[in-house]
Every structure is written in structure tokens, then in C-alpha cells.
Amino acid sequence: MPPGVELSEVQGNVLHAYGADFPCARFVRLRLASQARAGEAATVVAGWLREVSFGRRPKGLPERDRLTPHLNLAFTAGGLTALGVPTTLLHEFPPEFRAGAKARAAALGDRWPDERPFTESHLLLSVHATGHAACERRVRELLEGNAAAGGPLEVVQERAAGDEGGGREPFGFADGGSQPAVEGVDLDPVGDGVYAARTAPAGRLRQRAEDLGIVQAKRDWRLVRTGEFLLGHAGEDGAAAPGPSAPLGPNGTFMVYRELDQDVHGFADYVAEQARRVGMPARELQEKIVGRRREDGSTLVRPAEDFPQPAPAQSARERNGRRRRSNDFLYTADPQGYRCPLGAHVRRTNPRDALPGGGERTMRHRIIRRGMRYAPPDEGLVFVCYAASIENGFEFIQRYWINDGAALGLGAAPDFMLQQAGEAGRPTGHMVIPGYRPVVLPPPDRPFVTVRGCEYLFVPSRRACAWLAGLHAAS
């Protein structure tokens, strides 16, 4: 484990996902009612900060705690300012965080809808629990404390998310199966770490490895440096990402909260129409657009026979092993995209070894994703990601891989799945599915996914939470 990695310092759900143990969540965005009430608001927030959950695996907890809802807090730049964080410390935060998501939206190609405006907040309170009722009860308890103090904080929005049935985004695909393997956290880098082919055996030894089907052996991979995800640690370039000094910065991270409305019926209708036109089964066409199999999320690069269906009572260890195996692939095995199209969504968001410089270049722009589908009846996704640099992580992926295909040899073509409406009010990007007779998919009449709004937040460590809780009292 790298020196200085203190997993108990990191808020829950960052390095260790709540996952299936806590499949439901409630996200509450709040802001100060007025700056004149900043002191009262700070007192309420200080109480919440003392109840924040940190990096513990649910399976390692006593049974009572495994059933207890988990609270996490994150702050916008405006929220830290309102709570009285000194200006000198605020200026140590990177400019994209200080500017906020709304100011950066145009550069990312976002056009937030005018109806139901997405109002900026000061802090995000999130509760994860075993069911929606437990989330609701815990949120009400926390907000009652605010009401008892006279309501110095106003609720901007509440969003219920998650699915007690588990694991699928609204278009029907298994989600969240590929996450970075992080140094100091994970043990097995295969599939989710950095692929470094230069460390692979050469000559006859290499040929023997190929014959045995173990080309992507463990020695060919390494874990992603901790500093890509946590402040105060070395990243892939050997340096720590810019951030505030102690006690506020180290072991903290940045969070992007994004609400993505999904046009489930529109996507299904489009796929059905195009499938009839090109003579392809609708399910196969869906999978070509996404780049993974709908049933289990396994890659199209490898044959389905490599991923036998799991037993119903599979253990967590077995599920994790299967997930790792499903991510043990390289796009150099499918350079023309005959199996997984070059424009498939999964290639656009994580090109792996397909970029010049291979997997090591890609790992400079990885994020940890913790998305959850909206609770019914709404259809969409709460996209949550964590990285030590919003600009180098989320924004880079959005600008240079999703909105622009040049780095992947696709010209200016956007991600077909995520493209937003253009100046004319509709998407403009095509998608090519390679083959003996290539299939060209025309732009849909309206986006499959619409960005409802977004916020950039700072997720403080245990020590930083204690410091923030005592900030108002000290002043």
C-alpha cells in the first residue's frame, strides 16, 4: 500500500462502493436561506458532519451497522464560501471547481433545459440505505434538525434514486461493471488497472502465454495511482493534483453530480425502426450502440461463451471475479471495431489501449463512477463520479472523448448515445457499425439522453470534516 493512504479517512462510496448492500439513495441539494444566517447554517452542518460515513466495507461491519443508512456530504465552492472557509484556502482550489458546473456547461456541450431550472446549491447531502423507506426516514430526521434551528438551510431539490431490484440503468443494461483498480485499495489490476505491455514476456515465453490464453497476465497490468482519485497523493504523472492544503485537502476528492434524463421509449422506437431497416435484431443493434451485452454487461470484444451465466446464489467474491474477467480485454484485439464498433459508447468513455500511447495515457483520465437510476416513475440516471481533478477527469472525457471523436479517429463525431441537441434543436451525429456491409445509423430526432443539470462538489476527508465542523466555533 502506498505510504499515507488512510482508507478510513475517505468518505464512504468513494473508494469502496455501497453497491448492492445499499441499493437505494436520496440526494438532497441545499443552500443557505440568507448569508445573514450563515452561523445558524454552520451549526446545523457541523452536526451533520459528525455523522458522515467513511471508508468501511459493509461486509466488515456489525449486523446492526450494515442496516444503518449512510450519510455523506459534499460542498460546492459557494457552499465553502458561505460556511466561512478562509479566502486563502478557497484560492487553493482549482479554477474549474471555483467556477462551478454552470459556468463550465457551454464548454462541455451542455444545454440544460429551461423548464424546471437546475438551481445551484451550496451542499449535497446523500443518504444510502437498504430501501427507499429507510432513506426517506433518515433524510427527514436530518432535515428536522434544520427545521428546529429555524430553517437556515433551504432544500433546493430532493432526488430519490436506486433500485431495490438492483443494477440496471433505464435502457436495460447492467451498469457500473467497470471501475478503476486503485493502488492501495484493490489487489487485482487485471482488466481495470493500467495495461503496460512492455512488461510482458517476449519470444517463445510470450508465444506460450498466447497459446495458453493468458496474454493479459497479471504481470501485464498494474494498479492506477491513488492520486488520480485522492488529493495529496501522487498520480500517474508522479505529482499530486492541485488542491487545498491541510487540513482541508488531503484524502479529499472532487465529485461531479449530474442528472441525466433518459428517453427510454424514444431509444426503443429508434432501435426498432433502424433494426427493421438494416435487417438486424433490435437487441443486437442496441448492444452495438452501447458496446456491451445487455444481459450481463460483458464486452463485445470477447465471445459470449467466455462469460457463462452466473449461478443465482453467487457469492460477492464470485460476482467480483466475474466482473474482473468481463473487463479483461484490450481494444487492440478488435482494431477495426467489427465486434465492438469504434463509436460504441463504452469505447468513447474509456478507450483503454486504443489511444496512441496505450492504456497508460487513458489512465490519466479515469474516474470512479457511482451512478444510480432515478427512482420510479422518473426515467434517468443520477451520474456521480469522483476524481482528484475535475478538469483532467470528467471534463477531459466529456470534451475530448464524448463530444469529439478526433482522438479516436472518428473526426468530430460525438458519442452517438450521449449526443445533445445541436444548434438546430436536434442531434446531428451518425454512427457507423463496421462489417462486410457497414451500417450507418442516422441521427435520432431527439437526444436519447438529456442533461438536466450538474454540480461540482468537494468531498472532504474525516479530518477535513472535523475541521469544517469546528470552523464556526473557532471564528
Regions found by a protein language model. Give the residues of each.
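Long, low-complexity, Ser/Thr/Gly/Pro-rich intrinsically disordered segments that act as flexible linkers
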Residues: 1-475
